[in-house]
């Protein structure tokens, strides 16, 4: 049946008896049809009236665009967070960590809440409900939610970020740097098969995940200068070890090995009981030739830390030892950033430790500036 002309829009009765409504938008000149055929003219008229009202109020956008926006605004915090994590260019271990914080602390309370309905009051109640028993995990979960909501602002799902809780910066660990002599004592207590890992971590500042993915093909050595080409990292994701990109783009870097450590690595590589042949052979492994796990290395390393009376130290502190030693050797902040694979000076500075012996040396040199020889 032909369309019946009206003052605005048109109605067409189909063979089925249902009514099809449409109109030509004065905004873009395109014809738009109702989302469905209506049972009666009254319902079709109502749809046309609502569209005309949007045009008159200068609020009109194409129906498909409105439907897409409505669907997006209905997405829940859990759905959006999962999408956010999946789309981020993050190392596998980082994605797993974010997913864990979200699964344990965000989804149980806020997961079913539409992103568009998130408010500062909801965030404050969620924050208070987590309690203060696990401050680090609580802070990390909040940081994940805040980052997710920042993207929601960019996607125009919310007008502003509802995460506005002022957090005190976590207290920095006051850790004194190890001396080379103490490092030797620590290494002496570590299982001999992968003892070289202690020296590599401490003198090159590699992350543990970077070290356990270094292969023979990643070692460039002309007999005088040795470089480790950091290109990949390994991390535990759930029950599996996943090899992927390094933590950041800057983390892909060549790291020059101090000559005395390079000599240790050459000796280690020449021992077929410690490293297999072939370009894909891992530099450090278990006695069975498998990838060295963080837990196994930690158990061995803790014995060394206990030997020097420093049970508070962790694996990652060896990276900070390396940053400190490099700074003491004269590395600039920019050079430290490159060596550690950091993107900001703040992060490079954060990894440096204080040294009592170094402080005494600085004090002596200050007296020398005054023309006084101690």
Swiss-Prot record:
Gene3D superfamilies the record matches: 1.10.150.130, Intergrase catalytic core
Occurrences of domain Tyr recombinase (ranges): 173-364
Keywords: DNA integration, DNA recombination, DNA-binding, Hydrolase, Transferase, Viral genome integration, Virus entry into host cell
Active-site residues, record numbering mapped to chain: 207, 247, 316, 319, 342, 351 (o-(3'-phospho-dna)-tyrosine intermediate)
GO MF annotations, alphabetized: DNA binding; hydrolase activity; transferase activity
A Pfam family recorded for this sequence: Phage_integrase
Family, as annotated: Belongs to the 'phage' integrase family.
InterPro entries according to UniProt: CB, DNA_brk_join_enz, Integrase-like_cat_sf, Integrase_catalytic, Integrase_recombinase_N, Tyrosine_recombinase_XerCD
Function: Integrase is necessary for integration of the phage into the host genome by site-specific recombination.
One GO term (biological process): symbiont entry into host cell
EC number: 2.7.7.-, 3.1.-.-
Superkingdom of the source species: Viruses
Tagged with keyword Hydrolase: yes
Keyword Transferase tagged: yes
SUPFAM superfamilies per the UniProt record, alphabetical: DNA breaking-rejoining enzymes
Name of this protein: Integrase
Residues annotated as signal peptide: none
Origin species: Mycobacterium phage D29
Record domain Core-binding (CB): where: 75-153
Gene for this chain: 33
């Amino acid at each position: 049946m032909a369309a019946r002309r009206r003052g605005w829009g048109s109605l067409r009765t189909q063979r089925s008896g249902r009514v099809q409504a449409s109109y030509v938008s004065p905004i873009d000149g395109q014809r738009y049809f109702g989302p469905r055929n209506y049972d009666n003219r009254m319902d079709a008229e109502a749809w046309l009236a609502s569209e005309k009202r949007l045009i008159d109020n200068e609020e009109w956008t194409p129906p498909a665009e409105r439907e897409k926006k409505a669907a997006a605004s209905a997405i829940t915090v859990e759905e959006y967070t999962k999408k956010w994590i999946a789309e981020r260019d993050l190392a596998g271990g980082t994605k797993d960590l974010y997913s864990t914080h979200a699964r344990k602390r965000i989804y149980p309370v806020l997961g079913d809440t539409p992103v568009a309905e998130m408010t500062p009051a909801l965030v404050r109640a969620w924050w208070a409900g987590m309690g203060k028993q696990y401050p680090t995990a609580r802070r990390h979960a909040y940081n994940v939610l805040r980052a997710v909501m920042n993207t929601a602002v960019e996607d125009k799902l919310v007008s502003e970020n509802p995460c506005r809780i002022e957090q005190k910066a976590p207290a920095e660990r006051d850790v004194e740097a190890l001396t080379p002599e103490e490092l030797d004592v620590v290494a002496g207590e570590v299982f001999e098969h992968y003892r070289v890992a202690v020296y590599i971590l401490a003198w090159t500042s590699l992350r543990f995940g970077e070290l356990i993915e270094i292969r023979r093909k990643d070692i460039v050595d002309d007999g005088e200068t040795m470089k480790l080409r950091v290109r990949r990292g390994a991390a535990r994701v759930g029950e599996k070890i996943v090899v992927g990109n390094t933590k950041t783009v800057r983390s892909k870097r060549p790291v020059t090995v101090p000559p005395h450590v390079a000599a240790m690595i050459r000796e280690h590589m020449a021992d077929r009981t410690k490293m297999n042949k072939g370009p894909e052979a891992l530099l450090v492994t278990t006695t069975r030739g498998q990838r060295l796990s963080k837990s196994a290395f930690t158990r061995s390393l803790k014995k060394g830390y206990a030997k020097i009376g420093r049970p508070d130290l962790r694996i990652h502190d060896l990276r900070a030892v390396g940053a400190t030693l490099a700074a003491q050797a004269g590395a600039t902040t920019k050079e430290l950033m490159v060596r550690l694979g950091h993107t900001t000076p703040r992060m490079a500075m954060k990894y440096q430790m204080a040294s009592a012996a170094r402080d005494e040396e600085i004090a002596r040199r200050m007296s020398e500036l005054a023309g006084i020889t101690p």
